C-alpha cells in the first residue's frame, strides 16, 4: 500500500554545536525525506555518532592524564618484577670464588629454594663469560677485603645502568683497597652496617609472634622483659655451672684492646681462654665446645677486635644459641641488635672492677641469672642472604631511574670506627 512521501526531521541539539574531534557540528537542523526504515536507520546512525563522540571525549588525554600515568607505571613495575637481574661476583670471598654459595652460578630457582629470597628473579655468577660482555651485568660485586685480581683489576667496560657494589663483612681495618682511589666508583654498599644499602649481618632476631625480623635495626620494637621469669632448664644448668667465663679467640693483638680487658678481668676471677691466645684448646666445630658453654660456664666473652658502628660477629650469635650470658665489648649500640636484658655490655661500666663485680653478682643470684633468658620465649635467631636484599634492590622500579655514587666511600667507611672504649682499661 502506497503511503506517499513521509518527511522526517532530526533536530541536532545546540549543545553539540562546534567542533568535537574532527567532526563539525555547526548544522543545527537537517530535514530529510525518508521512509520508516530510513528514519530508524537515521536514528541508529545518530546514536552511533553520539557514542563515538563520547568515547573520544572520555579517552581524551586532557581528561585521563592520571590513568595514562598509572597504566605506564603499572606496566613498568611489572616489567621490573618479571625480568631477571644478573649479578657478577668479581672477586673472591676470602679465597672462595662462590662466596659460600652452593654453585658457581645460581638462578631464580636456587634463590627461591636454597636462599629463600622473597624476590628471586636474579642470576648470580662468578663466571665472567656467563653473559657475552661484562657490561651487560646489572650489578658487579667487589669484596673489599680482597685485592683486585692481578690480571683483571677492574672491568674494562662499564655501562650507565650498571651497579658496582662495595661488599665487606669485616671491619674497616680489614679493607685491602685504597679507597681514596675509588671515589665515585661504587653505587651501593653491602656491609654489616645498618645504614648500608644492602644489609649483611652475621645474624638476625625474629619476633616469633609477629613472624618478622626486627633486629638488627635502627630502633627495634623490643618487648619488655617480664618482672618475673622462670625457666626450669636454665635453673638446672645454672646449678651445675662452676666456671665464670670462657673466651674463644684467635687474634691476640687488636685495635679494640679486647685482650687487655680479658686480662684485667682475670684479676677478679678466672677466664678460660681457648685458641691461639690462651692455654686451652677446643676444635672449631666440635659440638663438645658448644655444649661445654651450657654445662660449665656462666658467661661467654663476645669481645670484638674493632670498635666500629654495628660491628658484631658470628661469635655473639653463636653464644646466643647456648645457655650462657654473652658479655659484649665493641663499638655497636647493642640495643639495636639484641633484646634488652639478654647480655651484659662492658661499655656500660666505668671500670673493669665494676664489670667484674656485677658478673659476680649475677653468678650468685639464680633468679637474676635465669632472667637473662626471657627473650627466648619471644624471639629466635635467623639469617638471610644479602643477595636476597641485593636482588630485591635491583628489582625496585624507583632504583631503575637513578644511579647513586659514593663520592667519598673512604670517609663513609673509616669514620665509623674509634680507638677508645668507654670502659677504662
UniProtKB/Swiss-Prot annotation:
GO terms for molecular function: fucosyltransferase activity. Gene3D superfamilies: Glycosyl transferase family 10, C-terminal domain. GO terms for biological process: fucosylation; protein glycosylation. Residues 1-37 are cytoplasmic. It is a single-pass type II membrane protein. The chain crosses the membrane at residues 38-58. This is Alpha-(1,3)-fucosyltransferase C. It comes from Drosophila melanogaster.
Amino acid at each position: 500500500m502506497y503511503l506517499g512521501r513521509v518527511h522526517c526531521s532530526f533536530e541536532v541539539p545546540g549543545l553539540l554545536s562546534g567542533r568535537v574531534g574532527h567532526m563539525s557540528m555547526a548544522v543545527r537542523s537537517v530535514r530529510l525525506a525518508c521512509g520508516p526504515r530510513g528514519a530508524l536507520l537515521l536514528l541508529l546512525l545518530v546514536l552511533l555518532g553520539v557514542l563515538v563522540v563520547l568515547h573520544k571525549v572520555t579517552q581524551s588525554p586532557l581528561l585521563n592524564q592520571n590513568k595514562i600515568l598509572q597504566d605506564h607505571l603499572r606496566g613498568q613495575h611489572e616489567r621490573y618484577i618479571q625480568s631477571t637481574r644478573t649479578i657478577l661476583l668479581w672477586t673472591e670471598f676470602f679465597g672462595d670464588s662462590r662466596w659460600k654459595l652452593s654453585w658457581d652460578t645460581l638462578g631464580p630457582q636456587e634463590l627461591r629454594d636454597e636462599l629463600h629470597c622473597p624476590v628471586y628473579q636474579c642470576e648470580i655468577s662468578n663466571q665472567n663469560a656467563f653473559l657475552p660482555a661484562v657490561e651487560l651485568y646489572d650489578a658487579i660485586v667487589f669484596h673489599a677485603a680482597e685485592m683486585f685480581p692481578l690480571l683483571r683489576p677492574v672491568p674494562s667496560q662499564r655501562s650507565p645502568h650498571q651497579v658496582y657494589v662495595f661488599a665487606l663483612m669485616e671491619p674497616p681495618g680489614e679493607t685491602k683497597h685504597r679507597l681514596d682511589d675509588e671515589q665515585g666508583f661504587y653505587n651501593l654498599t653491602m656491609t654489616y652496617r645498618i645504614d648500608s644499602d644492602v644489609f649483611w649481618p652475621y645474624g638476625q632476631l625474629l619476633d616469633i609472634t609477629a613472624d618478622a625480623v626486627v633486629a638488627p635495626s635502627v630502633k627495634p620494637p623490643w618487648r619488655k622483659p617480664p618482672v618475673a621469669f622462670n625457666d626450669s632448664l636454665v635453673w638446672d644448668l645454672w646449678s651445675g655451672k662452676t666456671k665464670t667465663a670462657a673466651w674463644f679467640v684467635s687474634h691476640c693483638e687488636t685495635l679494640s684492646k679486647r685482650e687487655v680487658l680479658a686480662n684485667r678481668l682475670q684479676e677478679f676471677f678466672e677466664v678460660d681462654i681457648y685458641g691461639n691466645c690462651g692455654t686451652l684448646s677446643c676444635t672449631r666445630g666440635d659440638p663438645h665446645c658448644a655444649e661445654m658453654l651450657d654445662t660449665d660456664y656462666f658467661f661467654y666473652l663476645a669481645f670484638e677486635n674493632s670498635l666500629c658502628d654495628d660491628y658484631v660477629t658470628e661469635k655473639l650469635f653463636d653464644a646466643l644459641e647456648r645457655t650462657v650470658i654473652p658479655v659484649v665489648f665493641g663499638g655497636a649500640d647493642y640495643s639495636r641488635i639484641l633484646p634488652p636484658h639478654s647480655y651484659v655490655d662492658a661499655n656500660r661500666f666505668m671500670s673493669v672492677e665494676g664489670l667484674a663485680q656485677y658478673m659476680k653478682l649475677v653468678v650468685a643470684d639464680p633468679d637474676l641469672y635465669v632472667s637473662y633468658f626471657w627473650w627466648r620465649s619471644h624471639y629466635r635467631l635467623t639469617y638471610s642472604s644479602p643477595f636476597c636484599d641485593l636482588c630485591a634492590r635491583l628489582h625496585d622500579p624507583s632504583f631503575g631511574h637513578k644511579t647513586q655514587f659514593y663520592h667519598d666511600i673512604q670517609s663513609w667507611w673509616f669514620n665509623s670506627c674509634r680507638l677508645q672504649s668507654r670502659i677504662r682499661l
